[in-house]
């Protein structure tokens, strides 16, 4: 959580007049742990729009219980938090974003379940 918060703060400082969309992937065993997730409270507060992504299949592989989007929102203390469990849904949502003066910050120790961010950005003229 501290790395994500510091990264978000640095990007906000660098782009103060831009809309900042922060996307955090929960990927590691600890970040997907229901008892650990509340440590992310207020981590994404500096973002104008905040998104959490995790892949249900990753939970299954790690034999962890499913996480409900409402639990994620509550843990992050952000009612407007968007939660995506499929990278295709995330990709569709991001493609529809207004792009003028918008910074999209991807934060993960994973791969957003194989989402090719560079290809997506090129195809969508980011």
Predicted region positions:
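ATP-dependent carboxylate-amine ligase
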Residues: 1-126
């Amino acid at each position: 959580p501290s790395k994500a918060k510091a990264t978000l703060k640095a990007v906000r400082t660098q782009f103060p007049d831009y809309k900042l969309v922060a996307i955090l992937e929960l990927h590691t065993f600890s970040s997907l742990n229901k008892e650990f997730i509340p440590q992310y409270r207020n981590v994404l507060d500096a973002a104008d729009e905040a998104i959490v992504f995790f892949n249900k299949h990753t939970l299954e592989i790690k034999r962890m219980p499913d996480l409900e989007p409402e639990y994620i929102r509550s843990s992050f203390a952000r009612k407007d938090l968007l939660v995506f469990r499929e990278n295709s849904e995330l990709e569709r949502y991001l493609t529809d974003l207004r792009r003028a003066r918008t910074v999209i910050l991807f934060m993960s120790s994973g791969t957003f379940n194989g989402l090719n961010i560079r290809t997506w950005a090129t195809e969508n003229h980011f």
